[in-house]
């Protein structure tokens, strides 16, 4: 794959990159940082891509790793005082953002990351089971189990919220 082809792929996957980063990081600034780091790393490591057919999967895997790197760094840097202030600010922002989200999207975001990420990749980003397994470095059976677990949890949560109304 050439650098020009990678550039086109990145532009085509822009929305997917953002929504995948958002499922892990939540903060728009952190998402932008992760995407930027992903693009830099992808261009610098393009020679490690063995099969052009898996370029999108490879790019998403790099993004997920970058998101986890940001999470690790931020957990080391945040002091307790800053965490209290940050938590308050995030709660206010999340409340405003959640008002814009549909009930289903809120239910998806409430899932544990282990099952949320496969749901986003499968139902929103249109990755197939095999690609998700490669991205998350798990078996296809594990992806299917996580999707089934997520569907069950979503079904239960949405029924509970309907009953509350």
Predicted feature residues:
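A short, charge-rich alpha-helical start-of-domain segment used by transcription regulators
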Residues: 1-19, 35
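Residues within the DNA-recognition helix of helix-turn-helix
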Residues: 13, 34, 146-149, 153
């Amino acid at each position: 794959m050439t650098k020009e082809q990678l550039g086109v792929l990145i532009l085509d996957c822009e929305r997917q990159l953002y929504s995948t980063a958002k499922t892990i990081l939540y903060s728009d600034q952190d998402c932008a940082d992760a995407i930027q780091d992903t693009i830099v790393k992808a261009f610098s490591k393009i020679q490690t891509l063995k099969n052009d057919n898996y370029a999108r999967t490879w790019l998403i895997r790099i993004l997920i790793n970058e998101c986890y790197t940001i999470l690790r760094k931020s957990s080391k840097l945040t002091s307790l005082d800053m965490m209290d202030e940050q938590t308050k600010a995030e709660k206010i922002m999340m409340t405003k953002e959640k008002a814009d989200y549909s009930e289903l999207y809120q239910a998806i975001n409430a899932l544990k990351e282990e099952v949320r990420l496969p749901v986003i990749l499968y139902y929103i980003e249109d990755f197939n089971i095999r690609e998700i397994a490669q991205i998350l470095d798990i078996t296809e059976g594990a992806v299917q189990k996580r999707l089934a677990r997520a569907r069950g949890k979503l079904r239960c949560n949405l029924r509970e919220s309907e009953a509350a109304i």
